[in-house]
Amino acid sequence: MEPKYQRILIKLSGEALAGEKGVGIDIPTVQAIAKEIAEVHVSGVQIALVIGGGNLWRGEPAADAGMDRVQADYTGMLGTVMNALVMADSLQHYGVDTRVQTAIPMQNVAEPYIRGRALRHLEKNRIVVFGAGIGSPYFSTDTTAALRAAEIEADAILMAKNGVDGVYNADPKKDANAVKFDELTHGEVIKRGLKIMDATASTLSMDNDIDLVVFNMNEAGNIQRVVFGEHIGTTVSNKVCD
């Protein structure tokens, strides 16, 4: 069976690395995620990763508490680098050649982000983990995921959610009548104000015709199911739904 997507970017929340603790980095949890990614990688799919930093730091609440927003955001970017290094180590543990590239140069721990080098790594079947956001404050890691996916010409962004199995018209944890969407267009997401990604990230994905698949990462095997075209979660694309 052939994969539906040949090159993907997986977007993980920082909280996904925290496990049941909710904060920090839980190594067994990271290793479990890395194992799933490694199993997909064996099929020949080219994989890049963007990981948030919310398990270690959140810039907006810090700014609300009085910290300078720019400094708060830079602090968060460093958190994403920590997550990237830990994930890369876990992927190496499963025999996957992995590189970390950061938008802020820190040559002693990672490569600087260079698009051509990232593409070469992917073509050589290495996984690339992008850290430090886009290197500028005020931009989320969702926007980083959309931008890097466009730059590496990814077929899809896999938005791996913590315990959420797709996109709903209301919060399913608060509304028992919430309805899940199987398919949406990027335009519908923006028009309805659905909080999948921020508006900048949604617009980037729409303008560059990149599919977005939102699914529950807590169910083992779901990454592989998405890559091979099984209909789980919610698919967002530019195709008009029937």
From Swiss-Prot:
GO terms for molecular function: ATP binding; UMP kinase activity. It is found in: Cytoplasm. Allosterically activated by GTP. Inhibited by UTP. Pathway: Pyrimidine metabolism; CTP biosynthesis via de novo pathway; UDP from UMP (UMPK route): step 1/1. InterPro entries: AceGlu_kinase-like_sf, Asp/Glu/Uridylate_kinase, Uridylate_kinase, Uridylate_kinase_bac. GO terms for biological process: 'de novo' CTP biosynthetic process; UDP biosynthetic process. ATP binds at K11, L12, S13, G14, G54, R58, N162, Y168, D171. UMP binds at G53, D73, I134, G135, S136, P137, Y138, F139, S140, T141. GO terms for cellular component: cytoplasm. Pfam families: AA_kinase. SUPFAM superfamilies: Carbamate kinase-like (SSF53633). The keyword Kinase applies. Its EC number is 2.7.4.22. Residues 19-24 are annotated as: Involved in allosteric activation by GTP. Keywords: Allosteric enzyme, ATP-binding, Cytoplasm, Kinase, Nucleotide-binding, Pyrimidine biosynthesis, Transferase. It is an enzyme of class 2 (transferase). It catalyses: UMP + ATP = UDP + ADP. Homohexamer. PANTHER family: URIDYLATE KINASE, URIDYLATE KINASE PUMPKIN, CHLOROPLASTIC. Catalyzes the reversible phosphorylation of UMP to UDP. HAMAP family: PyrH_B. Belongs to the UMP kinase family. This is Uridylate kinase. It comes from Streptococcus pyogenes serotype M1. The gene is pyrH.
